[in-house]
Amino acid sequence: MSGPHPTGLHRLAETIAARKGADPETSWTAKLLAKGPEKCAEKFGEEAVEAIIEAVKGDRAKLISEAADTLYHLLVMLAARDVTLSDVENELDRREGRSGIEEKASRK
């Protein structure tokens, strides 16, 4: 978590983690997670495509809305595979200060 005041993404990630054991009948997040990682990944992909469409169309408000949906579904997909937002942040920290070209080359 980043600092004493968690960001909106951290609060959302914490809520998603808390919903992992919730009743799928009362929680949309629990319902998604109960369907398994593959379904969570599918939903993330659908939302990402919707965000892409709005980016191409140029509708700022709709893009913001779809981006929020995409981030939510990314966090759900990560939670389905027991990957935390902190895990992703650690990877970003590891990459910081390296050029994208250099970083991509190091993965080959």
Curated annotation (Swiss-Prot):
EC code(s) of this entry: 3.6.1.31
Keywords assigned by UniProt, alphabetized: Amino-acid biosynthesis, ATP-binding, Cytoplasm, Histidine biosynthesis, Hydrolase, Nucleotide-binding
Cytoplasm in keyword set: yes
GO molecular function, one term: ATP binding
CDD domains, alphabetized: NTP-PPase_HisIE_like (cd11534)
Biased composition (Basic and acidic residues): 91-108
Listed GO biological process terms: L-histidine biosynthetic process
Pathway stated in the Swiss-Prot or TrEMBL entry: Amino-acid biosynthesis; L-histidine biosynthesis; L-histidine from 5-phospho-alpha-D-ribose 1-diphosphate: step 2/9
Subcellular location per the Swiss-Prot or TrEMBL entry: Cytoplasm
Enzyme class: hydrolase
GO cellular component: a single term: cytoplasm
Renumbered residue ranges of the record's region Disordered: 88-108
Catalysed conversion reaction: 1-(5-phospho-beta-D-ribosyl)-ATP + H2O = 1-(5-phospho-beta-D-ribosyl)-5'-AMP + diphosphate + H(+)
InterPro entries the UniProt entry points to: HisE, PRib-ATP_PPHydrolase-like
Family: Belongs to the PRA-PH family.
Listed name of the protein: Phosphoribosyl-ATP pyrophosphatase
Organism: Paracoccus denitrificans (strain Pd 1222)
Gene: hisE
